[in-house]
Amino acid sequence: MIKAGIIGATGYTGAELVRILSRHPEVELVALTSRSYAGEGMAGVYPSLTGYTNLTCENLTPDEVMDRAEVIFIALPHGHAVPVATRARERGIKVIDLGADWRFRNARTYEEWYKIQHGNHELAARAVYGLPEIHREAIRSAGLVANPGCYPTSAILGLAPLLKGGYIDPATIIIDAKSGVSGAGREARVTSLFVECNESINPYGVASHRHTPEIEQELSALAGKEVKVTFTPHLLPISRGILSTMYATLVRPASTEELRRVYEKFYAGEPFVHLLPPGQWPHTRWVYGSNNCHLNLAVDTRTGRVVVASAIDNLTKGASGQAVQNLNLMCGFPETMALEVPGLCP
């Protein structure tokens, strides 16, 4: 039984962690931190957790959490995880950070896009990017795992087989992605209000979204050369879910059937990545509440381009479910433990 603590437990990703870990047979939650809800029961903050946790949120220092826990999840805004993770690694405690602070092998890229100093370039270079389907073996031996962003998870899983196999021109990739409102977090803001989001869809972060360099870093590693993408996210009036539709030019003619075989081979044995049958395109509601990624693709023979669609739940495979998948790998548990649930549908 592993003792785990969550720093920043009352945001959406923190609450999703509690939901999943409350049914994990090898994890004991020993600390939930929150400044805003200190002294309140977690089930009072999120009544959906009633009957699954009796823990109280506490305003603890990171060291106080580490005194109790063998592994910590950090679910804080970017810029806050560096000192916490640095201290945890000094104490030999495993860390899974759900924010952006450790996702870049070169911390200068982080500083350029997030406009803040990093604080520990050396440790950033040693952190493992926590996408199990790509970095499984490195995650097993990692002490610090950088949980991927939600958009990058969807995009990388969608494009990895094509780039690894050299089937597409890396200079032609377009990623059109759409996310539910929970991706913006729980903090109150005008753009997340019901009357602002409902019956509307809009692009944001055009040509400037901070997930762009994260996507490019991982796709470049897969391709073995520099990859630059055009990435445009959109806000959907749904609670959770991401649908990414990706386009790229083929370097040689290929059929849909040939590329389907490439995907089937690449993801053979993967418990959470599923290539749907021909003609059945991913729906966000099919992965709602699950750690699954649904994929499909088709070749447009008129234009010589391939179209790939990828759907995930932004809070589960795009955040907390993937964090638990990483925990399982780091601790030697079955990778699917506490995660084997289908999407909620309808």
From Swiss-Prot:
InterPro entries: AGPR_AS (IPR023013), AGPR_type-1 (IPR000706), NAD(P)-bd_dom_sf (IPR036291), NAGSA_dehydrogenase (IPR050085), Semialdehyde_DH_NAD-bd (IPR000534). SUPFAM superfamilies: Glyceraldehyde-3-phosphate dehydrogenase-like, C-terminal domain (SSF55347), NAD(P)-binding Rossmann-fold domains (SSF51735). It is an enzyme of class 1 (oxidoreductase). Pfam families: Semialdhyde_dh, Semialdhyde_dhC_1. Keywords: Amino-acid biosynthesis, Arginine biosynthesis, Cytoplasm, NADP, Oxidoreductase. One of its GO terms (molecular function) is NAD binding. PROSITE patterns: ARGC (PS01224). GO terms for cellular component: cytoplasm. It is found in: Cytoplasm. It comes from the Bacteria. GO terms for biological process: L-arginine biosynthetic process. Pathway: Amino-acid biosynthesis; L-arginine biosynthesis; N(2)-acetyl-L-ornithine from L-glutamate: step 3/4. It catalyses: N-acetyl-L-glutamate 5-semialdehyde + phosphate + NADP(+) = N-acetyl-L-glutamyl 5-phosphate + NADPH + H(+). The active site is at C150. Its EC number is 1.2.1.38. The keyword Phosphoprotein does not apply. The keyword Kinase does not apply. NCBIfam families: argC (TIGR01850). Catalyzes the NADPH-dependent reduction of N-acetyl-5-glutamyl phosphate to yield N-acetyl-L-glutamate 5-semialdehyde. Belongs to the NAGSA dehydrogenase family. Type 1 subfamily. HAMAP family: ArgC_type1. This is N-acetyl-gamma-glutamyl-phosphate reductase. The gene is argC.
